Each structure stands twice: as C-alpha cells, then as structure tokens.
Design a protein with these regions (language model features):
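Positively charged n-region of N-terminal signal peptides that target proteins for export
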Residues: 1-4
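Short, well-ordered, aromatic-rich surface patches in folded extracellular/luminal domains
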Residues: 19-44, 103-173
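Short, solvent-exposed loop/hinge segments that bridge or flank secondary-structure elements
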Residues: 47-59
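Acidic/histidine-rich, surface-exposed loop or edge segments in extracytoplasmic proteins
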Residues: 60-74, 129-133
Length: 173
C-alpha cells in the first residue's frame, strides 16, 4: 500500500507541472528596427463614445476636448527626434503584432470609461486598434497603449501651440 501511495504521489508531482494549455510563442516583430519614412499614427481618446481628443501625425494636428466649449484644434508637427522616440516605443511593444487588445473577459462595467482608437502606419501596413476600460480590466497590450498615449500627450503638451489652446470647462459624469 505504501508503494502504491508513493507511486501515486510521484505521478501527481510529475503531472502537476504539466498544463494542457501551451504557452504561445511571442509574435515575431515584423516592424523594421529603423523608423520607416511612412511612419505615422493617429490616436483619438476620451470618455466613452466622446473620443474628442486627437493626436494626428498624418495631418500634423491636435484636437483638444474642451468639454462644454466644444473642441479646439492646433497645428502641431512632431520633430523627427520625437517621432523616432515614439516609433522606438511602438517597436519595443511590437504594436503591429498586437491582436486581442480590447478583450479582458471581465463581467464588470463602469461609467464613465476611457476609450482609445489608434491608427498606425508602418512600412506600408496600416493597423487599427481600439480598447476601453468599460469592463474595468484592461489587457496588458491595452495598458501598454495607454502608457504610450500618455507619453505622446506629454510631448504634445510641451508644444507652444498646445499651450495656447483654451482650457476645458466642465466635466464628464
């Protein structure tokens, strides 16, 4: 009986380390390491369906949500150095290989919620990505996109043309 218990424990120990799920290998980064000449992006963001804020390198424009006062637009061109630093971050997170950005499987719901819509062009390929925190949790990829957007926002907010835009009035509930 002892022998049977020992064999059972050994088998249990061996099989407990195994899993039916296989770890997916990371998607190979197909982005060129150096920033291509056609690299551009646009991100719209805000609360829920009110994604009035926009940073658009295709059009060299920024739109600021003024809440009760509508929106204001400024012509802002990011420098080559700034575009390189943004591209480097996108390359490091393999943004063109991202897939399930929005899905978390959470049953939670909250209002208001953040939402970002991205359009990115790299080396002739265009990628659209959307995520929100409406269902409370976000994927790790969505979290990376949020950090990237905040990084880009910090760059934009240092620009004189952005500083000259009116302040927002009011708030979202």
């Amino acid at each position: 009986m002892k022998r049977l218990c020992i064999i059972f424990i050994i088998i249990l120990c061996i099989t407990s380390g195994c899993s039916w799920k296989t770890n997916q290998p990371p998607i190979a980064n197909s982005m060129p390491q150096e920033m291509p000449g056609d690299f551009n992006f646009m991100v719209r963001f805000g609360y829920g369906e009110v994604t009035k804020n926009e940073i658009n390198s295709y059009e060299d424009q920024v739109v600021k949500d003024l809440i009760n006062k509508g929106t204001a637009t400024a012509d802002i061109t990011l420098t080559t150095e700034e575009m390189h630093s943004i591209y480097k971050k996108m390359y490091e997170m393999n943004v063109m290989g991202m897939k399930d950005v929005a899905f978390t499987g959470s049953n939670c719901s909250k209002i208001p919620y953040n939402e970002d819509n991205w359009k990115i062009t790299v080396d002739g390929e265009m990628k659209s990505l959307t995520w929100s925190d409406q269902h409370c949790d976000v994927t790790s990829e969505a979290d990376q996109l949020l950090k990237l957007r905040k990084f880009i926002q910090q760059i934009v907010e240092t620009k004189e043309a952005y500083k000259e835009l009116p302040e927002a009035e009011g708030g979202y509930e």
